Amino acid sequence: VHIPDGRKVGEALSRVTHLGVGAHQDDLEFMAFHGIVECHDSDSQWFAGVTCTNGAGSSRSGAYSDHTDDQMQEVRRAEQNLAADIGKYAAMIQLDHPSAAVKDTGDTALRDDLLEILRLTRPRVVYTHNPADKHETHVGVTAATIEAIRRLPADSRPQTVIGCEVWRGL
C-alpha cells in the first residue's frame, strides 16, 4: 500500500470517501477523474485507488520494447504510485493479480481482496469499469467489485457506484 502523505495505513484507509477500482495502471486517472479532482486538496474527502492487475501484459514499444514482464510490472507500479502522489490520494493499493485470474469467474481471490479493502475504507462512492465494457479484464474487475459490495452488510455499502468507460467504445 502506497500512502502519498506518509500516514499509517489504517489511518489513511479509514479517511477514504471515494474509491476507484480499476483493472490496469492508468485506468483510474481516466475513469475516476471526477473523484480524484473532487478530493484533491480537500480536508474532508479522500480518494483511494485500487489497481487489480500486475501490469505484466502492458504494451511494449519504444523505450519499453525490450522490457521483460517483471520490468514492465515495476515501471507500471512506479507510474501508478507517481499518479497517486500527484493526485494526493489517501492511498494507492496495487493487488498484482494476473489478468487471466481476474477474467476467471471461478477465481475468488480478487473479490476477497476487494471485500477486505471495502471493509477497511467504507467509501461513499465507488468508481469501477462499465459492465458493458469490451475489455474482458475490465469486466472481470467490475464483476468482482459488485460481488464484493453485495457481500457487505446493506448499511456498509457505498451510496453510489459508478461504472466508467475507459477503453474504446461500448
What are these regions (language model features)?
Residues 50-53, 82-98:
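A conserved beta-strand->alpha-helix junction
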Residues 14-15, 19-71:
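ATP-dependent adenylation/pyrophosphate-handling site
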Residues 21-23, 50-52, 95, 127-129, ...:
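Active-site neighborhood of phospho(di)ester-bond hydrolases with catalytic His/Asp-centered motifs
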